[in-house]
Amino acid sequence: MNEELNDARRDFLKVAAALPAVAVAPWAIAQGPVVAAGPASAPDIAPVDRVFITNEDSNTISVINPMSNAVDTTINLTSFDEDARPPFRFVTGGVMPTHAAMIHKPLYHGCIDAHGAVPNPDGTLLATSGRGSSNIYLIDAVNRRVLGNAANPQAGTTTNPERLSSGILLGREPHEPAFTRNGKELWVTLRGEDRIAILDVGQALKQVGGVPSNAVRAYVPTLNGPAQVWFSKDGKLAFVISQKVAQLEILEVNPDANGHSRPRRLRLVDLGTQDKPAFTPFQKLSPDGTQMWLSHKLADAVSVVSVKDPGTVLATLALGEMARPNHLEFVDNPRGQVTYMSLARVDDGGPNAAASSRLAIIDRSVPLAQQKVVGMVYTGGREAHGLWTNPANNLLYVAHEQDELPGTPNAGQVVCSAFDVSTPLQPKLITQIPLGSLKLPSGELRNKKSINLVYVRPGTKGQTA
């Protein structure tokens, strides 16, 4: 087994070495001067902009202010310290539980495995999924708080001022939520089942607010192990990927006069050639709305699927052995058009001579038949996962799952990396942002294992509009 892994590692490094100069010394190139194309514009940051990151092991959401590139809020999705008695505390008798053990403490009713996150079309509302707790939470993106929390009758100096909402229970393994383009519904893939929960957003807001409501409009049968839904630009089609079968399902949204869906299957696509391991966790629509890009994590590839001819696979691009792609993001600006793929694998030789993951860079300015990985850049963190750009497409944030190693500047911390992508083919690291801890009355809960990341400008139409 070790020999196989070493062979795969060598194969990956051979691929990286064979790439153009931008990939040969990715960290050095990323730090180097940009091409002579005039002065790069400053990152477009509005005062309301925030980066939201779900932390799966700590069940928290880190909120970064891109103006300062520091965490300004940590949203608490745990139920610790709502009561001063020991069974309700995070730290009991001076003993701090491990992240894995903390959710098994008696009377815990908080989130388990905070994972998915997505903004609604105008960026004022976020939906976050708890994989293990089988629910979703709604987050006020303007005030950065959980909707539905109640005043804690036992609030005091040793307890929290609020009791955590239960969110909305849906089913086993809710993975990724997605708002419809009109913002009226929230579709949540239940990865532990073979169905999608469809919520009426208006009713969901009432339900978490304590008004008796039936937020779930329907459960729609779909592929086994559905991982994510993403909608076409016109909102008429829903693309459904799976982490259990090598298939892509395309549904017609078929909205009624009130904008509520009446889904029906349009096509079922066999991806056995493109994704033999049958493990596609993430997808995203290209900026022009013509292509859906699918990340095949265990196949170490990304497929490009037509939206005009729904489901037709236009290309599949190899990313290198053991690359293990997670999420993807598009950056289109006057200096270039690229797709960035976050790679989970970790290699030596990153910033500060520390181990780091990489971003694969695919040049999309050339015809599709010529598109391929043209470079890689170290992310400055370990096991890169979620990534998202600002509205101007000149700033990029990348989340990481693993803690930084001993002897590094942010040892023991999970970090988010900020990049200047004003020249898309030459992303440059701005800074590593340690996510720190949630300060609970009984002790500090370290933010750990970042998964999804979204960049939000409340009140402005974003990528889900």
Task: Describe the predicted segments one by one.
Residues 73-75, 101-107, 148-150, 162-167, ...:
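A short beta-strand motif characteristic of beta-propeller blades
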Residues 1-11, 15-26:
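N-terminal secretory signal peptides
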